[in-house]
Protein backbone atom coordinates (compact mmCIF):
# COMPACT_ATOMS: atom_id res chain seq x y z
CA UNK A 1 0.00 0.00 0.00
CA UNK A 2 1.41 3.38 -1.02
CA UNK A 3 -0.13 5.85 1.43
CA UNK A 4 1.93 8.73 0.04
CA UNK A 5 0.93 8.35 -3.61
CA UNK A 6 -0.14 11.79 -4.92
CA UNK A 7 0.99 13.41 -1.63
CA UNK A 8 4.14 15.31 -0.66
CA UNK A 9 6.77 13.04 0.89
CA UNK A 10 10.33 14.19 1.60
CA UNK A 11 11.16 11.53 4.21
CA UNK A 12 14.56 9.88 3.70
CA UNK A 13 14.10 6.29 2.57
CA UNK A 14 17.63 5.02 3.04
CA UNK A 15 18.44 4.23 6.65
CA UNK A 16 20.76 1.78 8.37
CA UNK A 17 18.92 -1.53 8.32
CA UNK A 18 18.58 -3.96 11.21
CA UNK A 19 16.65 -6.42 8.99
CA UNK A 20 13.64 -7.00 11.23
CA UNK A 21 10.62 -8.93 9.86
CA UNK A 22 7.68 -6.62 9.08
CA UNK A 23 4.55 -8.77 8.73
CA UNK A 24 1.45 -6.58 8.90
CA UNK A 25 3.36 -3.41 7.92
CA UNK A 26 3.27 -1.47 4.66
CA UNK A 27 5.70 -2.93 2.12
CA UNK A 28 7.69 0.30 1.89
CA UNK A 29 9.19 -0.13 5.38
CA UNK A 30 12.39 -2.20 5.40
CA UNK A 31 12.50 -2.65 9.19
CA UNK A 32 11.14 -1.14 12.39
CA UNK A 33 13.83 1.56 12.53
CA UNK A 34 12.92 2.67 9.01
CA UNK A 35 9.25 2.77 10.07
CA UNK A 36 9.90 4.98 13.12
CA UNK A 37 12.25 7.38 11.33
CA UNK A 38 10.11 7.78 8.23
CA UNK A 39 6.73 8.28 9.87
CA UNK A 40 8.23 10.76 12.37
CA UNK A 41 9.80 12.79 9.57
CA UNK A 42 6.63 12.78 7.49
CA UNK A 43 4.47 13.99 10.37
CA UNK A 44 6.80 16.69 11.72
CA UNK A 45 9.26 17.97 9.11
CA UNK A 46 6.94 17.02 6.23
CA UNK A 47 3.94 18.62 8.02
CA UNK A 48 1.70 15.69 7.01
CA UNK A 49 0.01 15.72 10.41
CA UNK A 50 -3.01 13.79 9.16
CA UNK A 51 -0.79 10.71 8.89
CA UNK A 52 -1.30 10.34 12.65
CA UNK A 53 -4.64 8.79 11.66
CA UNK A 54 -2.72 6.18 9.65
CA UNK A 55 0.03 5.43 12.13
CA UNK A 56 -1.74 5.57 15.53
CA UNK A 57 -4.53 3.23 16.58
CA UNK A 58 -7.91 4.66 17.53
CA UNK A 59 -7.41 3.64 21.16
CA UNK A 60 -3.65 4.28 21.51
CA UNK A 61 -2.78 5.75 24.93
CA UNK A 62 0.12 8.21 25.04
CA UNK A 63 1.42 8.61 28.58
CA UNK A 64 3.19 11.80 29.66
CA UNK A 65 3.53 13.39 33.08
CA UNK A 66 1.54 16.42 31.91
CA UNK A 67 -1.44 14.47 30.57
CA UNK A 68 -2.63 11.34 28.80
CA UNK A 69 -4.11 11.27 25.32
CA UNK A 70 -6.17 8.45 23.86
CA UNK A 71 -6.32 7.64 20.16
CA UNK A 72 -5.24 9.04 16.82
CA UNK A 73 -7.62 12.02 16.96
CA UNK A 74 -6.10 13.41 20.16
CA UNK A 75 -2.55 12.71 18.94
CA UNK A 76 -3.34 14.64 15.75
CA UNK A 77 -4.74 17.61 17.67
CA UNK A 78 -1.77 17.69 20.06
CA UNK A 79 0.62 17.68 17.11
CA UNK A 80 -1.25 20.57 15.48
CA UNK A 81 -1.24 22.51 18.76
CA UNK A 82 2.51 22.02 19.13
CA UNK A 83 3.13 23.26 15.59
CA UNK A 84 0.94 26.31 16.24
CA UNK A 85 3.37 27.22 19.02
CA UNK A 86 6.55 25.96 17.33
CA UNK A 87 5.95 25.88 13.55
CA UNK A 88 9.59 25.20 12.63
CA UNK A 89 10.04 22.21 14.93
CA UNK A 90 12.49 19.56 13.74
CA UNK A 91 13.23 16.16 15.28
CA UNK A 92 16.76 14.85 14.80
CA UNK A 93 16.95 11.11 15.48
CA UNK A 94 19.95 10.37 17.68
CA UNK A 95 19.23 6.65 18.05
CA UNK A 96 16.48 4.03 17.86
CA UNK A 97 16.92 1.01 20.14
CA UNK A 98 14.36 -1.70 19.63
CA UNK A 99 13.08 -5.05 20.83
CA UNK A 100 10.13 -7.36 20.30
CA UNK A 101 8.85 -8.68 16.99
CA UNK A 102 6.20 -8.17 14.34
CA UNK A 103 3.86 -10.77 15.85
CA UNK A 104 3.61 -9.54 19.46
CA UNK A 105 4.61 -5.97 18.66
CA UNK A 106 7.87 -4.06 18.37
CA UNK A 107 9.14 -1.82 21.17
CA UNK A 108 11.14 1.21 20.06
CA UNK A 109 13.11 3.69 22.16
CA UNK A 110 13.52 6.76 19.95
CA UNK A 111 16.09 9.26 21.26
CA UNK A 112 15.45 12.65 19.67
CA UNK A 113 17.17 16.02 19.74
CA UNK A 114 14.43 18.50 18.90
CA UNK A 115 14.91 22.15 17.93
CA UNK A 116 12.24 24.82 17.51
CA UNK A 117 11.35 28.51 17.84
CA UNK A 118 8.50 29.69 20.06
CA UNK A 119 6.42 31.75 17.61
CA UNK A 120 2.99 31.16 19.16
CA UNK A 121 1.50 30.92 22.63
CA UNK A 122 1.98 27.60 24.41
CA UNK A 123 0.91 25.96 27.65
CA UNK A 124 3.87 27.71 29.28
CA UNK A 125 2.84 31.23 28.31
CA UNK A 126 2.85 33.76 25.45
CA UNK A 127 5.25 33.45 22.52
CA UNK A 128 8.82 34.48 23.36
CA UNK A 129 10.42 34.14 19.89
CA UNK A 130 13.20 32.20 21.61
CA UNK A 131 14.90 29.15 20.13
CA UNK A 132 15.28 25.95 22.12
CA UNK A 133 16.94 22.55 21.71
CA UNK A 134 16.37 19.70 24.12
CA UNK A 135 16.13 15.91 24.34
CA UNK A 136 13.09 13.65 24.06
CA UNK A 137 12.70 9.87 24.27
CA UNK A 138 9.58 8.18 22.93
CA UNK A 139 8.94 4.51 23.73
CA UNK A 140 6.37 3.07 21.34
CA UNK A 141 4.77 -0.32 20.96
CA UNK A 142 4.08 -0.86 17.26
CA UNK A 143 2.01 -3.61 15.68
CA UNK A 144 0.36 -4.02 12.26
CA UNK A 145 1.66 -0.68 11.00
CA UNK A 146 0.26 1.33 13.93
CA UNK A 147 1.55 2.64 17.24
CA UNK A 148 -0.71 1.06 19.85
CA UNK A 149 0.89 2.46 23.04
CA UNK A 150 3.43 5.19 23.77
CA UNK A 151 5.33 6.63 26.74
CA UNK A 152 6.74 10.09 25.98
CA UNK A 153 9.28 11.97 28.08
CA UNK A 154 10.85 15.30 27.27
CA UNK A 155 13.08 17.70 29.14
CA UNK A 156 10.37 20.26 29.89
CA UNK A 157 12.55 21.97 32.50
CA UNK A 158 15.07 22.86 29.78
CA UNK A 159 12.25 23.86 27.43
CA UNK A 160 10.75 26.34 29.90
CA UNK A 161 14.16 27.71 30.88
CA UNK A 162 15.38 28.19 27.31
CA UNK A 163 12.16 29.96 26.35
CA UNK A 164 12.94 32.52 29.05
CA UNK A 165 10.28 31.51 31.57
CA UNK A 166 10.74 31.20 35.33
CA UNK A 167 10.49 27.42 35.69
CA UNK A 168 9.07 27.61 39.21
CA UNK A 169 6.43 30.15 38.16
CA UNK A 170 5.40 27.89 35.27
CA UNK A 171 5.14 24.98 37.72
CA UNK A 172 3.04 27.04 40.14
CA UNK A 173 0.65 28.06 37.36
CA UNK A 174 0.30 24.46 36.14
CA UNK A 175 -0.27 23.25 39.71
CA UNK A 176 -3.24 25.61 40.03
CA UNK A 177 -5.00 23.96 37.07
CA UNK A 178 -7.17 20.94 38.00
CA UNK A 179 -5.34 17.72 37.16
CA UNK A 180 -6.69 15.70 34.23
CA UNK A 181 -8.75 12.80 35.62
CA UNK A 182 -7.02 10.28 33.34
CA UNK A 183 -3.64 11.44 34.61
CA UNK A 184 -4.79 11.39 38.23
CA UNK A 185 -6.06 7.81 37.92
CA UNK A 186 -2.94 6.63 36.08
CA UNK A 187 -0.63 8.32 38.60
CA UNK A 188 -2.33 6.50 41.46
CA UNK A 189 -2.24 3.13 39.69
CA UNK A 190 1.48 3.57 38.94
CA UNK A 191 2.24 4.58 42.53
CA UNK A 192 0.47 1.44 43.74
CA UNK A 193 2.15 -0.82 41.16
CA UNK A 194 5.70 0.29 41.92
CA UNK A 195 5.25 0.35 45.68
CA UNK A 196 4.01 -3.25 45.67
CA UNK A 197 6.44 -4.73 43.14
CA UNK A 198 9.87 -3.28 43.97
CA UNK A 199 12.30 -4.53 46.64
CA UNK A 200 15.69 -3.36 47.92
CA UNK A 201 17.31 -6.69 47.04
CA UNK A 202 20.89 -6.51 45.72
CA UNK A 203 21.84 -8.00 42.37
CA UNK A 204 25.19 -9.59 41.40
CA UNK A 205 27.50 -7.32 39.40
CA UNK A 206 27.43 -8.27 35.70
CA UNK A 207 30.17 -6.04 34.38
CA UNK A 208 33.03 -6.19 31.97
CA UNK A 209 33.11 -9.95 31.34
CA UNK A 210 29.36 -10.34 30.79
CA UNK A 211 27.75 -10.67 27.37
CA UNK A 212 24.35 -9.95 28.93
CA UNK A 213 24.20 -6.20 28.38
CA UNK A 214 20.54 -5.94 29.39
CA UNK A 215 21.14 -7.95 32.56
CA UNK A 216 24.14 -5.74 33.34
CA UNK A 217 22.07 -2.55 33.09
CA UNK A 218 19.06 -3.92 34.99
CA UNK A 219 21.28 -5.17 37.83
CA UNK A 220 23.14 -1.86 37.96
CA UNK A 221 19.93 0.18 38.15
CA UNK A 222 18.53 -2.10 40.85
CA UNK A 223 21.70 -1.73 42.90
CA UNK A 224 22.00 2.05 42.51
CA UNK A 225 18.36 3.07 42.90
CA UNK A 226 16.86 0.40 45.16
CA UNK A 227 19.80 -1.09 47.08
CA UNK A 228 21.36 2.40 47.41
CA UNK A 229 24.78 1.11 46.27
CA UNK A 230 25.75 4.27 44.45
CA UNK A 231 29.40 3.24 44.51
CA UNK A 232 28.66 0.70 41.77
CA UNK A 233 28.93 3.68 39.41
CA UNK A 234 32.71 3.45 39.84
CA UNK A 235 32.91 -0.09 38.46
CA UNK A 236 30.27 0.29 35.75
CA UNK A 237 31.09 3.57 33.97
CA UNK A 238 34.27 4.47 32.09
CA UNK A 239 36.55 7.17 33.54
CA UNK A 240 35.33 9.80 31.07
CA UNK A 241 31.72 8.62 30.74
CA UNK A 242 29.10 11.21 29.77
CA UNK A 243 25.57 11.51 31.18
CA UNK A 244 23.08 13.68 29.30
CA UNK A 245 20.15 14.43 31.60
CA UNK A 246 17.46 16.86 32.68
CA UNK A 247 17.95 20.64 32.36
CA UNK A 248 20.09 20.03 29.25
CA UNK A 249 22.96 19.04 31.50
CA UNK A 250 25.91 16.92 30.39
CA UNK A 251 27.81 15.42 33.31
CA UNK A 252 31.29 13.96 32.86
CA UNK A 253 33.06 11.29 34.84
CA UNK A 254 32.11 8.90 37.60
CA UNK A 255 32.05 11.47 40.41
CA UNK A 256 29.53 13.73 38.67
CA UNK A 257 27.39 10.77 37.62
CA UNK A 258 27.34 9.36 41.16
CA UNK A 259 26.37 12.82 42.45
CA UNK A 260 23.45 12.92 40.00
CA UNK A 261 22.03 9.71 41.47
CA UNK A 262 22.76 10.83 45.04
CA UNK A 263 20.85 14.10 44.66
CA UNK A 264 17.70 12.39 43.43
CA UNK A 265 17.82 9.53 45.95
CA UNK A 266 18.54 12.02 48.73
CA UNK A 267 15.60 14.23 47.77
CA UNK A 268 13.01 11.53 47.03
CA UNK A 269 12.71 9.55 50.26
CA UNK A 270 11.45 5.95 50.30
CA UNK A 271 12.37 5.89 46.62
CA UNK A 272 11.52 2.81 44.58
CA UNK A 273 12.70 2.29 41.01
CA UNK A 274 10.98 -0.04 38.55
CA UNK A 275 12.61 -0.97 35.23
CA UNK A 276 9.51 -1.53 33.12
CA UNK A 277 10.99 -2.50 29.76
CA UNK A 278 14.51 -3.16 28.48
CA UNK A 279 15.92 -3.91 25.02
CA UNK A 280 19.25 -3.61 23.21
CA UNK A 281 20.95 -3.47 19.82
CA UNK A 282 24.61 -3.69 18.73
CA UNK A 283 26.39 -0.34 18.38
CA UNK A 284 29.13 0.74 15.97
CA UNK A 285 31.83 0.36 18.64
CA UNK A 286 31.46 -3.38 19.07
CA UNK A 287 29.32 -3.01 22.18
CA UNK A 288 25.62 -2.59 22.86
CA UNK A 289 23.12 0.24 23.15
CA UNK A 290 20.59 -0.58 25.88
CA UNK A 291 17.25 1.21 26.36
CA UNK A 292 15.22 1.18 29.58
CA UNK A 293 11.81 2.63 30.32
CA UNK A 294 11.43 3.13 34.06
CA UNK A 295 9.28 4.56 36.85
CA UNK A 296 10.26 6.07 40.19
CA UNK A 297 7.97 6.56 43.17
CA UNK A 298 8.72 8.06 46.56
CA UNK A 299 8.03 11.10 48.71
CA UNK A 300 9.28 14.67 48.67
CA UNK A 301 10.89 14.12 52.05
CA UNK A 302 14.10 16.20 51.93
CA UNK A 303 14.92 19.69 50.70
CA UNK A 304 17.67 18.56 48.32
CA UNK A 305 16.75 19.55 44.78
CA UNK A 306 13.30 21.05 45.31
CA UNK A 307 13.22 23.06 48.52
CA UNK A 308 11.24 22.70 51.74
CA UNK A 309 9.86 19.13 51.82
CA UNK A 310 6.12 18.65 51.49
CA UNK A 311 6.01 14.90 52.07
CA UNK A 312 3.84 14.52 48.98
CA UNK A 313 4.05 11.29 46.97
CA UNK A 314 6.00 11.73 43.74
CA UNK A 315 5.79 9.83 40.46
CA UNK A 316 8.55 10.11 37.85
CA UNK A 317 8.32 8.56 34.39
CA UNK A 318 11.71 8.24 32.73
CA UNK A 319 13.54 6.69 29.82
CA UNK A 320 17.24 5.99 29.39
CA UNK A 321 19.70 4.79 26.79
CA UNK A 322 23.13 3.42 27.70
CA UNK A 323 26.07 3.00 25.30
CA UNK A 324 28.27 0.13 26.44
CA UNK A 325 31.80 -0.10 25.03
CA UNK A 326 34.35 -2.65 26.25
CA UNK A 327 32.01 -3.73 29.04
CA UNK A 328 31.57 -0.25 30.57
CA UNK A 329 29.02 2.52 30.11
CA UNK A 330 30.65 5.17 27.95
CA UNK A 331 27.60 7.39 27.48
CA UNK A 332 24.12 7.64 28.97
CA UNK A 333 21.00 9.60 28.11
CA UNK A 334 18.47 9.77 30.95
CA UNK A 335 15.41 11.92 30.32
CA UNK A 336 12.50 12.71 32.63
CA UNK A 337 10.11 15.64 33.01
CA UNK A 338 11.57 17.53 35.94
CA UNK A 339 9.03 20.30 35.49
CA UNK A 340 6.30 17.77 36.30
CA UNK A 341 8.04 16.99 39.60
CA UNK A 342 7.84 20.67 40.52
CA UNK A 343 4.16 20.72 39.52
CA UNK A 344 3.45 17.81 41.88
CA UNK A 345 5.26 19.61 44.70
CA UNK A 346 3.52 22.96 44.12
CA UNK A 347 0.17 21.19 43.90
CA UNK A 348 0.87 19.76 47.36
CA UNK A 349 1.81 23.20 48.68
CA UNK A 350 -1.45 24.65 47.35
CA UNK A 351 -3.35 21.86 49.07
CA UNK A 352 -1.54 22.52 52.36
CA UNK A 353 -2.28 26.26 52.06
CA UNK A 354 -5.98 25.54 51.64
Regions found by a protein language model. Give the residues of each.
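C-terminal and inter-domain tail/linker signature
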Residues: 1-354
Amino acid sequence: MDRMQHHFDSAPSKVKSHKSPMAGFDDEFTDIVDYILRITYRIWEGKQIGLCYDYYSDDCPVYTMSGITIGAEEVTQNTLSTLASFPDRTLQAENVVWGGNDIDGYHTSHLIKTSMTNLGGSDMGPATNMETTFLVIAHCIVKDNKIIEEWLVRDNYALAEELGFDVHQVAREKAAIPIQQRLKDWNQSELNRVQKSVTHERQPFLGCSSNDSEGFIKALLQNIWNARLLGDVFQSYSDDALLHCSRNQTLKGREEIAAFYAQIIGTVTQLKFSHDYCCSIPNDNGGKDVAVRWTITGNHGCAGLYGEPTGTPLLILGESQFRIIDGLIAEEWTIFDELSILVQIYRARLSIAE
